[in-house]
Amino acid sequence: MGCTVSRRRTTTAEASSAWGIFGFYRPRSPSPPPQRLSLPLTVMDCPICLDVAATEAQTLPCMHKFCLDCIQRWTLTSTACPLCNARVTSILHHVDSDASFVETPVEGATDVDGEEDEPVGGGFAVIWGEDYTEEVRHEEAEGQGSGSGSRARPRVPVFNWLYGQVSTVIESDPIREAVVDNIVEIIQEHGMNRQRVTEAMLPMFGANTHALVDTLFDISAQWMRRMQRRAPMSHQGVNYIDTSESEAHSDSEVSSPDEEDSGASSSGVHTEDLTEASESADDQRPAPRRSPRRARRAAVLRREQRRTRCLRRGRTGGQAQGETPEAPSSGEGSSAQHGASGAGAGPGSANTAASARSSPSSSPSSSMRRPSPSASAPETAAPRGGPPASSSSGSPRSATIFIDLTQDDD
């Protein structure tokens, strides 16, 4: 009985909760669904632009992932993978399954080992109505001459960029070639007129025409400025007007026979005034100059040589050189007699000469003594080459020669 009452109370409580207090029906809230484990979503960042890849693309055969726009611009300049440096043969993009994908072959870029493929876009090399095929051929030869492993930049980046932009919109190769040919013809026809080029390309690209033309003109202007900075190629150059014949003819008419006989040329320069290059170089060559140190060393060396000669002459009494000895003067007689009495004839004369040179009272005029016939006494003079004469007192007399050492020889 108790169980029945409790069951009825439970049923009444459920009904009241379902119909509400005032009798309105209130449906029960549905039970929440079971929670699922959410794995973190991995977003691929492009290694080239370091941003989230909007359209994911993979390179074959290395299967590295990049942005589609980034890897397409990269393959325009090099077929090497930015990550592993392997040769990229094609690009996979818009991959839905193993059987649904788009594969774009890579062509027209520089290989890793320095080899170049065929130029992109059928070999177009026309910039603003002028043919640059010869120039592109020369520059490609320069790129091949570089060492292996070097990545050469595209020689005509305007059309490489244009071909890449068209390839992002049109995937069919024949249609892509036709569109590029049409753009080249428009550029050849209208040149640098931006308005006419925009009007001619408007049916093909629609609303994207203005942005495409603006970018195309900017890249073309940069390329043209770069080409103007470079030196002209071997097949190009500046054509100068050669007026040498007309000038020579006019000079021959104006010049008279007298001027021709005098040796005057058409330029007005006389051949008589011309000198050899060696002579003019010798005339303009400056005279050698000695440094002060070398000059002082040379002066000291000359003084030592003079001093040595003076000592030798004093020891031999001037007989070896054939000089006539003379008596010392009154001012220097005391020093000479003192040297002669102290050390004999030979060494005494050397000591006397040294003392005479070291004495500060001797003047430069009195230090220079030369033997003269009038100053020498007849009894002291000795014949040339004979024995030394003796004085009246019988004591030997030494002959002293004084040479001024303060003056240098020229």
Swiss-Prot record:
Annotated GO biological process: protein monoubiquitination; protein polyubiquitination; release from viral latency; symbiont-mediated disruption of host cell PML body; symbiont-mediated perturbation of host exit from mitosis; symbiont-mediated perturbation of host ubiquitin-like protein modification; symbiont-mediated suppression of host cytoplasmic pattern recognition receptor signaling pathway via inhibition of IRF3 activity
EC number, as in UniProt: 2.3.2.27
Keyword Zinc-finger carried by entry: yes
Pfam family name, one: zf-RING_2
Cited InterPro entries: Znf_RING (IPR001841), Znf_RING/FYVE/PHD (IPR013083), Znf_RING_CS (IPR017907)
PTM notes: Auto-ubiquitinated.
PANTHER family named in the record: E3 UBIQUITIN-PROTEIN LIGASE TOPORS, TOP1 BINDING ARGININE_SERINE RICH PROTEIN, E3 UBIQUITIN LIGASE
Source organism superkingdom: Viruses
Signal peptide positions (record): none
Keyword annotations from UniProtKB, A to Z: Activator, DNA-binding, Early protein, Host-virus interaction, Inhibition of host innate immune response by virus, Inhibition of host IRF3 by virus, Inhibition of host mitotic exit by virus, Inhibition of host RLR pathway by virus, Metal-binding, Modulation of host cell cycle by virus, Modulation of host ubiquitin pathway by viral E3 ligase, Modulation of host ubiquitin pathway by virus, Repressor, Transcription, Transcription regulation, Transferase, Ubl conjugation, Viral immunoevasion, Viral latency, Viral reactivation from latency, Zinc, Zinc-finger
Enzyme class: transferase
Taxonomic lineage from the root: Viruses, Duplodnaviria, Heunggongvirae, Peploviricota, Herviviricetes
Residue stretches of biased makeup (Basic residues): 287-315
GO MF, any single term: ubiquitin protein ligase activity
Catalytic reactions on record: S-ubiquitinyl-[E2 ubiquitin-conjugating enzyme]-L-cysteine + [acceptor protein]-L-lysine = [E2 ubiquitin-conjugating enzyme]-L-cysteine + N(6)-ubiquitinyl-[acceptor protein]-L-lysine
Function: Evades nuclear antiviral defenses triggered by dsDNA viruses. Acts during the initial stages of lytic infection and the reactivation of latent viral genome. Prevents the antiviral effect of nuclear bodies by degrading host PML and SP100.
SUPFAM superfamilies: RING/U-box
Stretches with biased composition (Low complexity): 329-340, 348-399
UniProt-annotated stretches for the region Disordered: 243-410
ZnF endpoints (RING-type): 46-85
Protein name: E3 ubiquitin-protein ligase ICP0
